UniProtKB/Swiss-Prot annotation:
The lineage of its organism: Bacteria, Pseudomonadati, Pseudomonadota, Alphaproteobacteria, Hyphomicrobiales. Mg(2+) binds at D71, E139. This is CTP synthase. Gene3D superfamilies: 3.40.50.880, P-loop containing nucleotide triphosphate hydrolases (3.40.50.300). UTP binds at S13, K186, T187, K188, P189, T190, Q191, K222. Its EC number is 6.3.4.2. One of its GO terms (cellular component) is cytosol. PROSITE patterns: GATASE_TYPE_1.
Length: 542
């Protein structure tokens, strides 16, 4: 029977509960346990798919097509276990399910209430499908005291009572702020956070205290006394210089030992050699490359979380440090791109939606093509590269995307149908935004002898995760290929372009999918490893 670890947060938001959950999962996995990580989000949206990147950050897409919280990306990268739509739930989805059942008459006329109906739905979600796992780690979004989180806290309170003794542990992540004028760490915010938790019936077993310095023995004793936990269960969560150092930092602080002690379990010491190797490469690079990310949400780095990590993985694979130069694509829409891009070793244009900044991305693709600078276009970045080729190579000055409005030359258009397996999926042009994209893992057939096939080890078919409504128009394929832009990857039915590349360019690849979603520190995605390798070569030429 699985044991459950509930991770909650207090004092302030954005403390890193997702990263802490992922690191703890990795430590338990390194001890030989099988783990599952899940995220419970208290907001009323059905999923983050239609939420602004500036508010929510990245939407992480799973193989089965779920649009989920970015923390699931941390879970996958740290444990290697692919997440599914069953690993993320929101209040919106829970209410939708309950109201659907109510309309159907499933509740037989009962009055629908938060307790027991909402809390039971949350409990059912948490407990479902966990056979075969030793530990299930559940992160509760938000902070203790948030009104929307109360049903989730009540549900996990009940679960501990429902399970056999010793099968649930509460870990509370909190902040110990340092006050320079007083010269000391302050424990009072944590005491109040735990007091709030205890007022709703939850006594944390372990305090994971974020801090930038050592916790003095007196403060540790005070936290243990007033928060009603053992002093050994007050874990010092020191800031780390990179996220892949967190598992080793938390192990050194005793987090995994204390979790196992709370369950009354003993286990072999964790095998952290692979994590040690990753950190050795991060701390001892043999060079550095500069990559320009020409995006439209650069003011919110969390909008590109998986992309940042995938580039880091490419650097790890090549034993180099990857320096990121964030460039808002609007800045050179009406200017020459060269002054902004001449110093970089590679250009990456990521995904995005809408017309804002599109012309700047097209200019970035043109600069990379003409100057022979490595270029990686992802999703929207591929589409803009194709439009650039149509305008400046094929001679179609009005080439554009129908996403931006009516155009006489629709190089990129809205997909209204596509295949998933043997079934045809369709969408109305007037449909809602939510859930209307081509989402999840789809296969792509690669051309034999193409650069991209070589990067994938000679593979002729791959599977990658997608998130897009618009697609390059194959009606222009022959004309583009006549001018050197090769369509080296298509959907198996030959209808949807998946990959384009220039044969006479050091490294210029555009992909319609999101390879960053499948990159891991121990298994860097081959496209990112190859892109950074090309940037290393470019750095020696500049």
């Amino acid at each position: 029977m699985a044991r459950y670890i509930f991770i909650t947060g207090g004092v302030v938001s954005s403390l890193g509960k997702g990263l802490a959950s992922a690191a703890l999962g990795a430590l338990l996995q390194a001890r030989g346990y099988k783990v599952r990580l899940r995220k419970l989000d208290p907001y009323l949206n059905l999923d983050p798919g239609t939420m602004s990147p500036y508010q929510h950050g990245e939407v992480f897409v799973t193989d089965d097509g779920a649009e989920t919280d970015l923390d699931l990306g941390h879970y996958e990268r740290f444990t290697g276990r692919p997440a599914t739509r069953q690993d993320n739930i929101t209040t919106g989805r829970i209410y939708q399910d309950i109201l659907t059942k109510e309309r159907r008459g499933d509740y037989l006329g009962a009055t629908i209430q938060v307790i027991p109906h909402v809390t039971n739905a949350i409990k059912d979600f948490i407990l479902d499908g966990n056979d075969g796992y030793d530990f299930v780690l559940c992160e509760i979004g938000g902070t203790v005291g948030d009104i929307e989180g109360l049903p989730f806290f009540e549900a996990i309170r009940q679960i501990k009572n429902d399970l056999p003794r010793g099968h649930a542990v509460y870990v509370h992540l909190t902040l110990l702020p340092f006050i320079p004028s007083a010269g000391e760490l302050k424990t009072k915010p944590t005491q109040h956070s735990v007091k709030e938790l205890r007022s709703i019936g939850i006594q944390p077993d372990i305090l994971l205290c974020r801090t930038d310095r050592t916790i003095p023995a007196e403060e540790r004793r005070k936290l243990g006394l007033f928060c009603n936990v053992r002093e050994s269960a007050v874990i010092e969560a020191r800031d780390a210089d990179n996220i892949y150092a967190v598992p080793e930092v938390y192990h050194a602080a005793g987090l995994d030992d204390e979790v196992l002690a709370a369950f009354g379990l003993e286990a072999p010491a964790p095998d952290l050699r692979s994590w040690h190797e990753i950190n050795a490469r991060v701390h001892n690079p043999e060079g550095q490359v500069t990559i320009a990310i020409v995006g439209k949400y650069t003011g919110m780095k969390d909008a590109y979380k998986s992309l940042i990590e995938a580039l880091s993985h490419g650097g790890i694979a090549n034993k180099v440090k990857v320096k990121l130069d964030w460039i808002e694509s609007e800045v050179f829409e009406n200017e020459d791109a060269a002054p902004f891009l001449e110093h970089v070793d590679g250009i990456l244009v990521p995904g995005g939606f809408g017309q804002r900044g599109a012309e700047g991305k097209i200019k970035a693709a043109q600069f990379a093509r003409e100057r022979h600078v490595p270029y990686f276009g992802i999703c929207f970045g591929m589409q803009m590269a194709v439009i650039e080729a149509a305008r400046n190579l094929v001679g179609i000055p009005s080439a554009n995307s129908t996403e931006f409005g009516p155009t006489s030359e629709p190089l990129v258009g809205l997909m209204t149908e596509w295949l998933r397996g043997n079934e045809l999926e369709k969408r109305s042009r007037a449909g809602d935004l939510g859930g209307t994209m081509r989402l999840g893992a789809y296969p792509a057939a690669l051309k034999r002898g193409s650069r991209v096939s070589g990067i994938y080890g000679g593979a002729l078919e791959i599977s990658e995760r997608h998130r897009h409504r618009y697609e390059v128009n194959t009606a222009y394929k022959d004309r583009l290929e006549q001018h050197g832009l090769r369509f080296s990857g298509l959907s198996p039915d030959g209808v949807l372009p998946e990959i384009v590349e220039y044969e006479d360019h050091p490294w210029f690849i555009g992909v319609q999918y999101h390879p960053e979603l499948k990159s891991r520190p121990f298994e860097p995605h081959p496209l990112f490893a190859s892109f950074i390798q090309a940037a290393v070569v470019q750095s020696r030429l500049v």
